[in-house]
Amino acid sequence: MALLQISEPGLSAAPHQRRLAAGIDLGTTNSLVATVRSGQAETLADHEGRHLLPSVVHYQQQGHSVGYDARTNAALDTANTISSVKRLMGRSLADIQQRYPHLPYQFQASENGLPMIETAAGLLNPVRVSADILKALAARATEALAGELDGVVITVPAYFDDAQRQGTKDAARLAGLHVLRLLNEPTAAAIAYGLDSGQEGVIAVYDLGGGTFDISILRLSRGVFEVLATGGDSALGGDDFDHLLADYIREQAGIPDRSDNRVQRELLDAAIAAKIALSDADSVTVNVAGWQGEISREQFNELIAPLVKRTLLACRRALKDAGVEADEVLEVVVVGGSTRVPLVRERVGEFFGRPPLTSIDPDKVVAIGAAIQADILVGNKPDSEMLLLDVIPLSLGLETMGGLVEKVIPRNTTIPVARAQDFTTFKDGQTAMSIHVMQGERELVQDCRSLARFALRGIPALPAGGAHIRVTFQVDADGLLSVTAMEKSTGVEASIQVKPSYGLTDSEIASMIKDSMSYAEQDVKARMLAEQKVEAARVLESLHGALAADAALLSAAERQAIDDAAAHLSEVAQGDDVDAIEQAIKNVDKQTQDFAARRMDQSVRRALKGHSVDEV
């Protein structure tokens, strides 16, 4: 497997020309910014010594506030206080309303169905809100480093799709930041721990943040980070713990389900405070809306146990993808504030058979890894031997005749990557080809996800199979896909960059992988049937053209035998007997062998007519 050097050409710098770079952990609940100073990566604090910046923005007509100031307004002005905006990135309004029906915001749909949040400052999309958080982090870094940033590395969940990654890059540009690279959060954590410990072997990175869960299985060897497999859930995190506990408190307190937004916010704040307290205490007293009661750690554990189990199921799938057993994992790194919950650490330790590493603050480890990566990419460590390989989560391919999916880049292929595959025309005189880009693990188009469509026109009018079209898939370091189709003889080409308007849900991602395993045998049979039907159609199409042109070369008996064979093939091709179709194709080939030879002889005679032997 090829290993990719992180350092980019032309970015090396002399020591006295050190460039300023930062790593940003743009989190669902909290965000951080870190940098490398005097050879050490560290997170940067605000004037009050706080390293975490709540990912909350409060909008007013005259301006906005970010972080702690914004969070204090959450209970007072819920409609104008936007939190957990990361969950909204890259999703349609319909998807958001279905998944998060209790959000206290008023939405409008843009022309293409994307969400616009109604605030006192006007209609704002999630990209703009994220940009305001990034601006606050960049301002902290600029002040701490006494200079403008030359570039940043921003972390994203490993399961973020194209739309979510592109939205993150757009937010950074809106904030005036130069993005060196988007980096998967678990991979950033591996960088932080790998450089510090220098250990070699298989490592699992269990990342349970506020809004997302990711599991990565990596192999470390002599400074090389190879991502063997990734998995996770793009809509599962500590926020879900909070909401479950808030609902439990609401039921105990007898508060109506559809109470006003202010009460809902008070419930959520009480749940968050109780969750934090229960990490150290066996029970906690809760006061909310005039009600007082006790919540025990045991009750909390019972509420969240199903969610923790879901994360472990994803861990099991990732291990299977990586081809390793749990007992082969040397170390387990936990990332994200939600891993402070005792039940999480306990269950993770039981699953992997060893206690997880916690020597680096789980809230800071991702930002620290991003800072190390940014320091390399900006050119401050040109001689670094650190290597990094990421993977794509689902296979990418094309629709072919018969509704089949031809995989071009398999799932878990390391990125960046470019793969090409040649295709040809199906019909005589075909001058255009529709390119349908697919994502998924199944064999048929109907069972996979459509990413994009575009057309290649200007193909030379040649017999079926005469034109050769090369389709190239390219996935960049940020996981964004571009597809190019080129007719090789003329050089005519068409391309598209895949930026879907919204992404897959967590259940869709999990089910696509699960279904590919559950229906593997069924899919193979369906593919074999579809392939034989396509071949039958091709044979009949070719035969009809040949008969129309040269039927005079056949005797009446020969023509009847060919017609009978073709009719039988046409009939069995309507059924689902693969062997019968295959035998019928062979019979047509047998009945037309002499006819094909005569046509070839006739073509040669026509080509030689009027030419001497010497000319030949």
UniProtKB/Swiss-Prot annotation:
Q: CDD domains this protein is in?
A: ASKHA_NBD_HSP70_HscA
According to the lineage, what is the superkingdom?
Answer: Bacteria
- Would the keyword Cytoplasm turn up in this protein's UniProt record? no
Cross-referenced Gene3D superfamilies, in alphabetical order?
Answer: 1.20.1270.10, 3.30.420.40, Actin, Chain A, domain 4 (3.90.640.10), Substrate Binding Domain Of DNAk, Chain A, domain 1 (2.60.34.10)
Keywords from UniProt, A to Z, are: ATP-binding, Chaperone, Nucleotide-binding
GO annotations under biological process? iron-sulfur cluster assembly
State the family named in the UniProt similarity comment for this chain: Belongs to the heat shock protein 70 family.
Q: Which HAMAP family match?
A: HscA
Protein name, UniProt field: Chaperone protein HscA
